[in-house]
Each structure stands twice: as structure tokens, then as C-alpha cells.
């Protein structure tokens, strides 16, 4: 009996399969936060009563469980699927399409469709597999025009891959540039940007948050701003210094004459500017690159303003540096000589910046153009040269130092002459012992003269000693001749003179650039201050007279007559 009532039920199930079919995609994949539409068609036998559709998770209880989507208003859906899963077909519809919005990772799984109402059927053999993966899409940033400094430009951030049926995304802009928000749509946001030169190369970020899932994505774009050259600088290096120095436009630079110089021009611009150099003279110059100017050996004529020009499509700008060349300080002189009743001295100096000259007499300073009864100073300058002359007509009772001093740009050079007491030269040119004459000598020359005198005295002393030794030998051998009355000294003369020491001093260049030097007269003579001391002499002896008759005795000694001549060395 039990099998009797089961047979009609089995037959009814078989009949139920006739006329039921489900056409749906077996599986779909969707990125997190996005939407997916699953097309579905269901076929079932006609019925006069209402027919509702339901989508359940695999394993759910069709009677007590909640579907994820349904068109039955009396049936509540699963809480986590509420507002996101939609059954697109209405009551008694053959449309079983499923729309999943704001997909979440928990949505991954298998689903089946069921009919309920006047028709009841579950399509568990036609399952739908849903896979939710991580979101890989990012926003798009579109620049409507070229970014030019100072010009307002619109930028658009959009998420065309998002679905309008889902929760509207939230747009955020991040930039250091001057911006303001423009028009907004569901899937796009507009930004008004006014770029500046400093915005070139900076980042602009559009960030999109999908609130339905809490997922946030963003895109960052580097701004390329077109602007004219600005902030020009010049990097310099010179001499043996391997380091560099950066100068702002209008700065000054001073280097030593003969040093090498490198000037590198730098400009901030986009696109990169074309660089060129201008210099104050027509002298050719060397360019390693268009931006670098080189002077292998700086000369005074290289002084002046050097101008670098930078130019691109947006404009031009220049930068300059003023170059001054500092030449070595050279002191020529002093040179002195007696002229008339005074001592005339002159001194010259060459340098750049132009030097200045002054005289120092003892502790006093003589400079400029000045005059009194004792001295006269005349100074002049032209270009790199400074000249000064000094006339001294004063007397000195003790030694004094006379210096010529040149200075330029914190550099000083000095040359000193020693003035000593001595006989003064009168108008007639004769020596007057009652008055002293100013004597000058450069210290170095004086030492050399003293050394020469010492060597000469040593030489003469040795020579005299040799002569005296020879005379003694001759006197011993011819002692008997001295008794001969025919043997007489006809003449004997002794002369003496003062020893004069001259101190020639190197002359100075009378005109700038002259390289010739004129010989100067001796600066002074040293008088003989030890008149009472005996002087060293050497003498040669010769005897002259008639020859005596030849003695009969051949062994007799021969007599020679001569005269004695004494000469001073």
C-alpha cells in the first residue's frame, strides 16, 4: 500500500520537469565595489495564479531561509544582500536576471533560482557561480588643454568602469597648485587649475572612494607646466679651486690675472631654454657647451659684464655677472740720484685695481702732491700705473730710512733706502767737510759692496806679503851693492786717494709698460774716515845706472843700478 501512493507522486515530479527550463550563465566574475548583471530566462507552465521568483544561496532553506533577491513583496531578503541584489523580472515574468551592485567579497558563492506561488520549482541543476575579486581599476585624469603658467585649465577625473546604479563614488583632489572644484556628475569630477612655475613637476592626485564597499582607489599624475625662463643663476669656478660657487644675477666676481675661469649659466624654464653668452669685448671665447663660457687665462681686457640670455617659447630672461681682474702688485724702484742741491728719487707701481704710492721718511709719511722747504712730492696715476717723485733738500745728522710704499686692494709692498751722513756736494761740486751730504744705499747693494771690499783687501794683503818676502831675499843677496856710491835712488813717490763706493740703484719705468731701464749715477760716495791709519801698498824695485868696468876677476859680484818706484794698489 505504501508504494501505491508514492507512485502518483513520482509521476507528478516527472510531469513537473516538462515545461521547466532555466537559461543562465554558469559563472560570473566581478571586481569588488562594481556591478554585474547576470542575464537569465526561465520557462514554466502557464498558471492562473501569481508566480514569484527567488534567488537563494546554495544550501539555503527555501522555506525558512531568506533569499538574496526576490520579487515577492511579502518575503524579506538576506540582510547583507539588501539593496545590492536585485531580481529584474516582475511577478509572473519569465525574466530571472540578477543584478548585483557594490559587489563584496562575501558575495562569492553559488546561487540557484526558484519559482514559488501557483507554480513551484527549484532549478538546482542550473546553478550560478559568482566570484568577487579585488578592484584593479583606477580613475582616469584628463587635462583639457596645455598647462601654461597663469592660465586656468580644466581637469577631469572619471570612473567610467563604475556603475551608475551603485552607490555614487566620492571624489577627492590633492594638489599643491591653486585649484577649485568645477562641475560634478555621478562618475566624474571637474577641477579648475591655475598652474604656476613652481607647480611644474608636482603631483596631482584624484582619489575615488566607493562607499558601498569602502574601497578607495586613486591616480596620480605629474603636472607639466609651460613657463618662461626664471630664477637664472651663474655657477662659477676659477683657478685651482675644484669647488664651485653659485652667483645670483648682478653679482660681482674678482679673480687673479692669469687664472682660469668657468661660467655656467643656469635657468629654470619649461621647455628648457636656449642659452647664449655675451661678453664686453670682441675677443673670441671658448664655449664647452652653450651654457658654459671658459677663459683659460684671464687678462685685464677680459674685465666687464658678462650676460647670459635664456629664451624659450614663453619668453626670455638675462642674467649677468661683473668680472674684475686683479693683477699682481708690482713695485718698481725707488731709484735715486743727486741732481743740483738735492736728492731726487722716483718710484712706480703697477697693479689692478690701480695702486697708490706714498713715501715714508723715518716716521713721517709723504704722499699726494705736497711741498715745503725740505721736500717736494709729486704723484700721478694712469690706468694700472701710479708714479711718484720725491726731491729731498734737507740734511740729516744721523741715519734715516726712506721707503716707497705701494698698496692696492689690501695688498702692500715696500722698498727701503738707508740715508747716511756724509760730505755735502757744493754748487761747485767740491767736497766740504764742514757739512754732511746725504748718502743713499739699498741694503742689498751695500752688503754686496762690503763683501767685495773685504775680498779685495784679503787679496791685496796676500799679494803684499809675497812682495815683502821677495824684497827681503833680494836685499840679502845684494847687500854689498848698497855700499856702492854709484848706486842711488833717483826718485821715490807715494800717492793716496779716497776709496769711493758707489751704490747704483735699479731705475724704474718712467712710463707704463716700459721695460727699459736707464743707468743711474752712483747714489753716494763713502769718504775716507780713517786718514791716520797706514794704507797697504806694494812696490816694485829696479836699479838703473852706468855699468861698471868688467872686473878681471870673473868671480866678482855684478852690480845693478835701478830706481825704486812705489805704486799704490
Swiss-Prot record:
Cystine crosslinks: 35-163, 40-96, 157-206, 265-308
Point out the glycosylated residues in this chain: 95, 151, 200, 203, 369, 372, 387
GO-annotated molecular function: monosaccharide binding; sialic acid binding
Protein's UniProt keywords contain Signal: yes
Its tissue distribution reads: Predominantly expressed by immature monocytic/myeloid lineage cells in bone marrow. Also found at lower levels in mature neutrophils and monocytes.
Q: Where is this region: Disordered?
A: 508-556
What are its GO cellular component terms?
lysosome; membrane
**Top-level taxonomic group:** Eukaryota
Q: Which residues cross the membrane?
A: 440-460
Cytoplasmic side residue ranges read 461-569
List residues binding N-acetylneuraminate: 114, 120, 122
Q: Where in the cell is it found?
A: Membrane
Calcium keyword on record = no
What are its GO biological-process terms? cell adhesion; regulation of endocytosis
> Where do we find the motif ITIM motif here?
536-541
Q: Which UniProt keywords apply?
A: Cell adhesion, Disulfide bond, Glycoprotein, Immunoglobulin domain, Lectin, Membrane, Repeat, Signal, Transmembrane, Transmembrane helix
All ranges on the Extracellular side of the membrane? 17-439
What is the protein's major site of localization? membrane
Q: Where is this motif: SLAM-like motif?
A: 559-564
Q: Span of the secretion signal?
A: 1-16
Q: Which family does it belong to?
A: Belongs to the immunoglobulin superfamily. SIGLEC (sialic acid binding Ig-like lectin) family.
Q: What is known of its domains?
A: Contains 1 copy of a cytoplasmic motif that is referred to as the immunoreceptor tyrosine-based inhibitor motif (ITIM). This motif is involved in modulation of cellular responses. The phosphorylated ITIM motif can bind the SH2 domain of several SH2-containing phosphatases.
Q: Which PANTHER family match?
A: MYELOID CELL SURFACE ANTIGEN CD33 (PTHR12035:SF132), SIALIC ACID BINDING IMMUNOGLOBULIN-LIKE LECTIN (PTHR12035)
Q: What does this protein do?
A: Putative adhesion molecule that mediates sialic-acid dependent binding to cells. Preferentially binds to alpha-2,3-linked sialic acid. The sialic acid recognition site may be masked by cis interactions with sialic acids on the same cell surface.
Q: What is this protein called?
A: Sialic acid-binding Ig-like lectin 5
Record lineage:
Eukaryota, Metazoa, Chordata, Craniata, Vertebrata
Amino acid at each position: 500500500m505504501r508504494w501505491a501512493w508514492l507512485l502518483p507522486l513520482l509521476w507528478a515530479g516527472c510531469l513537473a520537469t516538462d515545461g521547466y527550463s532555466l537559461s543562465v550563465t554558469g559563472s560570473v566574475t566581478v571586481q569588488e565595489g562594481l556591478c554585474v548583471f547576470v542575464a537569465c530566462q526561465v520557462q514554466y507552465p502557464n498558471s492562473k495564479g501569481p508566480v514569484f521568483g527567488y534567488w537563494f544561496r546554495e544550501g539555503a532553506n527555501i522555506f525558512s531561509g531568506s533569499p538574496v533577491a526576490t520579487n515577492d513583496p511579502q518575503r524579506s531578503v538576506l540582510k547583507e544582500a539588501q539593496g545590492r541584489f536585485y531580481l529584474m523580472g516582475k511577478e509572473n515574468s519569465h525574466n530571472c536576471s540578477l543584478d548585483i551592485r557594490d559587489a563584496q567579497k562575501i558575495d562569492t558563492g553559488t546561487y540557484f533560482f526558484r519559482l514559488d506561488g501557483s507554480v513551484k520549482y527549484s532549478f538546482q541543476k542550473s546553478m550560478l557561480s559568482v566570484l568577487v575579486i579585488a578592484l584593479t581599476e583606477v580613475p582616469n585624469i584628463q587635462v583639457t588643454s596645455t598647462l601654461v603658467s597663469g592660465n586656468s585649465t580644466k581637469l577631469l577625473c572619471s570612473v567610467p568602469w563604475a556603475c551608475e546604479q551603485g552607490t555614487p563614488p566620492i571624489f577627492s583632489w590633492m594638489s599643491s597648485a591653486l585649484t577649485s572644484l568645477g562641475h560634478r556628475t555621478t562618475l566624474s569630477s571637474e577641477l579648475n587649475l591655475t598652474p604656476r612655475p613652481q607647480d611644474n613637476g608636482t603631483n596631482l592626485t584624484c582619489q575615488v572612494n566607493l562607499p558601498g564597499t569602502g574601497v578607495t582607489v586613486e591616480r596620480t599624475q605629474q603636472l607639466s607646466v609651460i613657463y618662461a625662463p626664471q630664477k637664472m643663476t651663474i655657477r662659477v669656478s676659477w683657478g685651482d679651486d675644484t669647488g664651485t660657487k653659485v652667483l645670483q644675477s648682478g653679482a660681482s666676481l674678482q679673480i687673479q690675472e692669469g687664472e682660469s675661469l668657468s661660467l655656467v649659466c643656469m635657468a629654470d624654464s619649461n621647455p628648457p631654454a636656449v642659452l647664449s653668452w655675451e661678453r664686453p669685448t670682441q675677443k673670441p671665447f671658448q664655449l664647452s657647451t652653450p651654457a658654459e663660457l671658459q677663459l683659460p687665462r684671464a687678462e685685464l681686457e677680459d674685465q666687464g659684464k658678462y650676460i647670459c640670455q635664456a629664451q624659450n617659447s614663453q619668453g626670455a630672461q638675462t642674467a649677468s655677472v661683473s668680472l674684475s681682474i686683479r693683477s699682481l702688485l708690482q713695485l718698481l724702484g725707488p731709484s735715486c740720484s743727486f741732481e743740483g742741491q738735492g736728492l731726487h728719487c722716483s718710484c712706480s707701481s703697477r697693479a689692478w685695481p690701480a695702486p697708490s704710492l706714498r713715501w715714508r721718511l723715518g716716521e713721517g709719511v709723504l704722499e699726494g702732491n705736497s711741498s715745503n722747504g725740505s721736500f717736494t712730492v709729486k704723484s700721478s696715476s694712469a690706468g694700472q700705473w701710479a708714479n711718484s717723485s720725491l726731491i729731498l733738500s734737507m740734511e740729516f745728522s744721523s741715519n734715516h730710512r726712506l721707503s716707497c710704499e705701494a698698496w692696492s686692494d689690501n695688498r702692500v709692498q715696500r722698498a727701503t733706502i738707508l740715508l747716511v751722513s756724509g760730505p755735502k756736494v757744493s754748487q761747485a761740486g767740491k767736497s766740504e767737510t764742514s757739512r754732511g751730504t746725504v748718502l743713499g744705499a739699498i741694503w742689498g747693494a751695500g752688503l754686496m759692496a762690503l763683501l767685495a771690499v773685504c775680498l779685495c783687501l784679503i787679496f791685496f794683503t796676500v799679494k803684499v806679503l809675497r812682495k815683502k818676502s821677495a824684497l827681503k831675499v833680494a836685499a840679502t843677496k845684494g847687500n854689498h851693492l848698497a855700499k856702492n856710491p854709484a848706486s842711488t835712488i833717483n826718485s821715490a813717490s807715494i800717492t793716496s786717494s779716497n776709496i769711493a763706493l758707489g751704490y747704483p740703484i735699479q731705475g724704474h719705468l718712467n712710463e707704463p709698460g716700459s721695460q727699459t731701464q736707464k743707468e743711474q749715477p752712483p747714489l753716494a760716495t763713502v769718504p775716507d774716515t780713517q786718514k791716520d791709519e797706514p794704507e797697504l801698498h806694494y812696490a816694485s824695485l829696479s836699479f838703473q845706472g852706468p855699468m861698471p868696468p868688467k872686473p878681471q876677476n870673473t868671480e866678482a859680484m855684478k852690480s845693478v843700478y835701478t830706481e825704486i818706484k812705489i805704486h799704490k794698489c
